[in-house]
Amino acid sequence: DTIVVMNEGQIQQIGTPTDIYNEPKNVFVAKFIGESNILPGIMKKDLLVNFMGRDFECVDSGFMKNEPVDVVVRPEDIDMVSDADENAHLHGKVKSVLFMGVHYEFLVECGSVTLTIHSTDYVAPGSDVGIIILPDAIHIMHKSVKPEELDFTTADELLEAEMDAELEDKDE
């Protein structure tokens, strides 16, 4: 299946449901498809991004060195561990907990940033926690010029190429 995500008549992204969920092309798509932590970052080099004051390995490449980017991390892709865990990338304090039926939704304050985290394990409000974000949980997007806006050239070119391919298939 192929999905086209549009905003006010403009194509934002074309792709499979999995591609759109896992690799949103802009802030609008990331918010449209589900809850996300969207953070400002700097792409240091291929496979390395800096956000929240530290460098994280990631699986993205093809960005310019030191390019400002938007970093998307889904709430279910963040692991909370003991604050003493030496593998923790970040440390924070649980500000609130909301039971959502199949999981808990936590708001965790990490310095000046509040992360939304989903987990099936309960942690009490006020608890200090460690945060682990693995490379494949980090999704990098080109920085939007304006909030929730994208240069539509890429999406339009993709749609045009798909339509041309369909016409060629019909001609053969």
Region spans (language model):
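Residues located in well-ordered beta-strands
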Residues: 16, 28, 42, 91-93
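Short beta-alpha junctions and helix-cap segments that line functional grooves
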Residues: 16, 25-26, 81, 119
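Non-catalytic connector elements of ABC transporters
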Residues: 36-38, 46-172
